[in-house]
Amino acid sequence: MAKTYIFGHKNPDTDAISSAIIMAEFEQLRGNSGAKAYRLGDVSAETQFALDTFNVPAPELLTDDLDGQDVILVDHNEFQQSSDTIASATIKHVIDHHRIANFETAGPLCYRAEPVGCTATILYKMFRERGFEIKPEIAGLMLSAIISDSLLFKSPTCTQQDVKAAEELKDIAKVDIQKYGLDMLKAGASTTDKSVEFLLNMDAKSFTMGDYVTRIAQVNAVDLDEVLNRKEDLEKEMLAVSAQEKYDLFVLVVTDIINSDSKILVVGAEKDKVGEAFNVQLEDDMAFLSGVVSRKKQIVPQITEALTK
C-alpha cells in the first residue's frame, strides 16, 4: 500500500507530535498499512518527557518532498505552518481544533475540526466511535496532549469534552493526572539551559492577519523573569528573524504555568496595535496580560482584530 504521511505543524508541541502518532495508529487499525507518523521539527523537553514515560519513540523527521504524496494533517491546516512542499501534496484528511485559514485543496477530502481544547480529544472520540482499542501508551499520549494544550485544564480553550476524555484516559494510562501533568509541564518549563534562538522557535507559529504577517512564539515557564531577563538578546534575535522572514510583527508570549498569566514582548512597526488589542500600554516593548494563557483563543483573535480594523 502507498505511504500516507501523517504530521502536525512546524515547531511541534506535544499535541502535534502525539496526534501524529495517534492518527497513524488509527489509520493502521482501519487497514491503512502505509500510514506513518512524522514530525516537522525537534521534540521539546515536555514532549520527550511524555514519550519517555509511555515508552514511545519519537516520529521520524520529515525530509521528503511531498509532491503527489498522500498526507494527513493533524493539529493544523494553515499552509505556512506545514511542510514546505504541502501545496503539491494530496491532502486526504485533516484533524484539527484551530481556525481554518490559508488552506485549499485540488480535490475533496475528509476534514474534522471541532472547537475543543486539543486535537487528541477529537482522536479519542474517533477511536471510541469506531470501537477501536486504546492501548495504554496511546492513552498516555492522548492524555499528555490534552494536559499540554489545556495547561492542566486551566486554559480557556479547555472544554468539558477535554476533561471527560482525560478522566477516562488516566485509567487506561494508569497515571495520576495532577501529579503526572505538573511533572510533564515542569519538564518543559525549564529555560535556563536553552538558547534565545531555541526559545523563539520551540513553539512558534506564523499567521496572516489581513495585510500583515505575524509571528507568535510562546514559552511556558515557572518564573517569567527567568526568560525575560534576556530581553535584550531576545529582541535582537526577534528583529533579525523578522527582517529575514519579512514578519511585520513578532510577539513573544511568556506564560506562567503556575499562576496562569503571561507577559508579552513585541517588536515590529505595528507593535502599538498589539497594545491596543489588549487595552494595555506597552512599556519598553512589554506588557503584562492577566489571565492570558491561550495563543489560540486569547491572543490570535485579539491581534487579528486590531490589525484588520
UniProtKB/Swiss-Prot annotation:
It is an enzyme of class 3 (hydrolase). Mn(2+) 2 binds at D15, D75, H97, D149. It catalyses: diphosphate + H2O = 2 phosphate + H(+). One of its GO terms (cellular component) is cytoplasm. One of its GO terms (molecular function) is manganese ion binding. Its EC number is 3.6.1.1. It is found in: Cytoplasm. InterPro entries: DDH_dom, DHH_sf, DHHA2, DHHA2_dom_sf, Mn-dep_inorganic_PyrPase. Mn(2+) 1 binds at H9, D13, D75. Binds 2 manganese ions per subunit. Keywords: Cytoplasm, Hydrolase, Manganese, Metal-binding. The keyword Manganese applies. Gene3D superfamilies: DHHA2 domain (3.10.310.20), inorganic pyrophosphatase (n-terminal core) (3.90.1640.10). Its cofactor is Mn(2+). Belongs to the PPase class C family. This is Probable manganese-dependent inorganic pyrophosphatase. It comes from Staphylococcus aureus (strain Mu50 / ATCC 700699).
